[in-house]
């Protein structure tokens, strides 16, 4: 039996479970069985309304120092995005299939391989270091790809209420680009969305003097918002960006000036800006143009940043040893559950396989990356809590 098989076997077991958000489909039961056998105490946390029940897992194995020792947590999600048109896949998206050295399936890269890797890494670590000093934790949810209202954030709230102290967290998101380990995420930008409605007066398009066209009135303000410089970024983050995603106005008829226009927009912002500061600037610009408007805000997540420290150095060293790659710290990409964990954990780093195929038809992971991924995770455990 080759050394790669335990991680690969667990990955394939998880993949076969059709755990589209918010369904877990027994994935966490598999993890609980494995982790319990390795000495973990496991707790299931069910959350969400009846029509959107979310399954969460908190598992911990205390080291000899008990709660006084360092606690390293792996965070991940068992849920996957929908497959899209199944007929466009070259194989069943929920039947792990090997072609050309790759494992094809929904969740192969995002992120069932990472989960399997850290479980097997923990099993190997515990077997080799039965008297380990620090503690190991798992925070797993089935609501990361969806609204994320009843997943990781709920467990973080529970841990905060209990006074649980997390020292390090590795999030298994697929962060690599061209090869395993070439990039890890030591932070993420925040996301702030707005729904702006500018009011005018509806009328016949042939009589504009009897109407007020909200599209025309909004256009100069939107141009100013699009051209604005929000901040300069910093050493870790690029400058904040503002983008419109949708504009809708009118009834569909071509002879009516609309009574209002609605614009959806989004900020991706760095630690150089704050939500309140960005909101204030938007309102200032809109007010300066004399618009009659309403604006509803949704904060998708605050930015977070882990500066170079013990966790990033442990990961970089492990990646160099196992992959022969010098990793790059990056804050690019979308939001992740790291934004919730960063509120209760001072060092949060994301690391997983290449992400080029995630959420796509024929999602896959290189089979040759699976064992090194597990080994990197094990080395991090050995460095920080052995």
UniProtKB/Swiss-Prot annotation:
E.C. code: 3.5.1.18
The keyword DNA repair belongs to this UniProt entry's keyword annotation: no
Cofactor note: Binds 2 Zn(2+) or Co(2+) ions per subunit.
GO biological process: diaminopimelate biosynthetic process; L-arginine biosynthetic process; lysine biosynthetic process via diaminopimelate
Record carries keyword Cell inner membrane: no
Cofactor(s) of this protein: Zn(2+); Co(2+)
Active-site residue list: 79, 144 (proton acceptor)
Reactions mediated catalytically: N-succinyl-(2S,6S)-2,6-diaminopimelate + H2O = (2S,6S)-2,6-diaminopimelate + succinate
Pathway where this protein functions: Amino-acid biosynthesis; L-lysine biosynthesis via DAP pathway; LL-2,6-diaminopimelate from (S)-tetrahydrodipicolinate (succinylase route): step 3/3
GO MF term list: acetylornithine deacetylase activity; cobalt ion binding; succinyl-diaminopimelate desuccinylase activity; zinc ion binding
Binding site for Zn(2+) 1: 77, 110, 173
Residues binding Zn(2+) 2, per UniProt: 110, 145, 359
Pfam families recorded: M20_dimer, Peptidase_M20
Keywords, comma-separated and alphabetical: Amino-acid biosynthesis, Cobalt, Diaminopimelate biosynthesis, Hydrolase, Lysine biosynthesis, Metal-binding, Zinc
Family: Belongs to the peptidase M20A family. DapE subfamily.
NCBIfam families according to UniProt: dapE_proteo, PRK13009.1
Record text on subunit structure and interactions: Homodimer.
Cited function: Catalyzes the hydrolysis of N-succinyl-L,L-diaminopimelic acid (SDAP), forming succinate and LL-2,6-diaminopimelate (DAP), an intermediate involved in the bacterial biosynthesis of lysine and meso-diaminopimelic acid, an essential component of bacterial cell walls.
Name assigned to this protein: Succinyl-diaminopimelate desuccinylase
Species name: Ralstonia pickettii (strain 12J)
